[in-house]
A protein has these predicted regions:
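RNase H-like (RuvC/DEDD) metal-dependent nuclease/polynucleotide-processing core
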Residues: 1-3, 8-244
Length: 244
């Protein structure tokens, strides 16, 4: 069986595919539809992108609120509010922020706007491909790392010590960890795929593979949006509780 972890990158989508027999593959896809076309028969595709969006209203997705509570400072800040669905179809940041403000009472951060197109891609895929809803599920890398390590990461993933911290967590779970960045670097430049993109996609793939018998989720009972998409973040490892 194939287990796929995916993270957005400057070149599109960076995917790590792992097999139970030890085989692995890394690849960049220009769009999520191409990724789905290749990996639609995978056991699971775990992706770092909001799935399931509110149409409006002042209440945030429960998974976002609970993920921040679980991570605690400073990692809680890595979980930003998901936009409402109408905002992701806007033609500009100003328009998107105005729509989000009108529909939810909150403006839109530039960070969220920078991935709006990717959120839209995944939303459209899941709304048009019912089979994808069974396999494509949302993760947040920091939740996955916390679940494996038993604590939130202490250092930023943008710093060398943070990348080392996360690599060590992955190595404790998956012996093939060192080979994945090597494979990625032999095929893609840093300006196409950043090192933290590689680690985030890898922790998603490892989560899918190790959690093949079942994954935990935040919240424990998933919410569904108005279109029937789950609003949750899945993980594998220790039971997740509030940050200490």
């Amino acid at each position: 069986m194939r287990y796929v972890g995916v993270d957005g990158c400057k070149a599109g989508w960076f995917a790590v595919m792992l097999r139970g027999d030890g085989d692995r593959e890394v690849e960049v896809f220009a769009d999520v539809s191409s990724l789905w076309k290749k990996h639609s028969s995978a056991a699971a595709i775990l992706i770092d992108i909001p799935i399931g969006l509110r149409e409006g209203g002042h209440e945030e997705r429960k998974c976002d609120r609970e993920a921040r509570r679980v991570l605690g400072p400073p990692r809680a800040s890595s979980v930003f509010p998901a936009p409402c669905r109408p905002a992701i179809h806007a033609g500009s940041y100003r328009e998107a922020s105005d729509i989000n403000k009108r529909m939810t009472g909150r403006g839109l951060s530039l960070q969220t706007w920078s991935i709006a197109r990717k959120i839209c891609e995944v939303d459209e895929l899941l709304l048009s491909e019912r089979a994808a809803r069974l396999r494509v599920r949302e993760i947040h890398p920091e939740i996955c790392f916390r679940a494996f390590a038993g604590h939130s990461m202490r250092h930023s993933k943008k710093r060398a010590e943070g990348r080392l911290e996360r690599t060590r967590v992955l190595e404790s779970i998956y012996s093939g960890t060192p080979g994945v960045p090597e494979d990625a670097r032999s095929a893609y430049r840093c300006r196409e795929v950043a090192t933290d993109d590689i680690l985030d996609a890898l922790v998603a793939a490892v989560t899918a593979m190790v959690g093949r018998e079942g994954l935990g989720s935040i919240p424990e009972t998933a919410e569904f949006d108005s279109r029937g998409l789950r609003m949750e973040m899945v993980y594998c490892g220790r039971d997740i509780g509030p940050a200490h």
